[in-house]
Amino acid sequence: MANVTGYTKAGVDKLVAPLFSSISPFTVGGHYYSPVTYFWPDFYNEGQAGKVSKWAKTLAYGNALGYVIMNRSTGDWSAKDNDFLTQAQRAAAAGAKRILWYIPTRYGVASLAKDDAARNGVPDPDKFTREYIMQLCANLRSQYDGLFQGVFLDEVINGWGAQAGRVGWYGDLIGEIRRTYGKNFTIAINPGSNITEAVCALDFDVCMSFENTAAKYLTDDPNSPIANDVMRALPSTKWWHVIHGVTRENFRQVIDRAASFGVSHLYVTDGELVEGEGGQWVPEKNPYQNPPSDWIMERVLAWNGGYLGLAERVAALEAKAAPSPQPGA
């Protein structure tokens, strides 16, 4: 058939593609399962007898997935790794809405004087300069091209106390990333706690503003609220809560608590953190070493789909209708 409109398909695609790429996959008020996927690519274990693929178990969440994180040796992006390329491709195909790539920032201590107390105990305090972080971003774009959809900046300041002096350094870093990669590139930050108004004003897309235990999540602390008034005024898609040490008994309380904060991105796991002598840098038990137990998946999918209450009622009815065990059975 002749082209009567004067437009070719290639021409239309070129015009329309930028419009679709600028549409966020996240809806304010929506629920997204955004796991902390620090484990190594293991797609080659999928379907192998006697082997388990942690990534396959994670990607089984399908369209419920929000963000996933690629983390090679705590941010070593000096060379292309085809295992990470393949795993990122599989994550995108499974339904992950954005692929983030891990880069630590060491709380910006590289910007401080050599004798500043904030540098004490921080590994490689001089390494993660703004220039070095930008070079890692450039490496990632060169190595993984369109799969480099965003960056997960770990070990970010919350802006309180003496950290206030480093907000400008983060503003410069985030601003340079934004100018280089554009408005559709995702910038995630992880202070792991509530943040000041000055940090809220930075040009990030999502902030992991809670990363701690279920016990702490379910406790009100007026001296350290999980979300302050400035944070609560921002869209739900800005916030990502990670809760470990979750149990069958407190799962629903955790979910209800997240709803009270207006959080779109959630990761709950029954994995536990035990810092031990290694502290936060080398913990004895890491809650992200493995995906959550299977019982969490069914509940998370119900939460994501908006039918958690119904699923719980059905489960309660099934339990009530189940025959009681007979003596001697």
Residue ranges and their predicted role:
Residues G6, G11, L15-S22, Y307-P325:
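Amphipathic alpha-helical oligomerization/assembly segments
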Residues A17-L310:
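Glycan-processing catalytic domains of CAZymes
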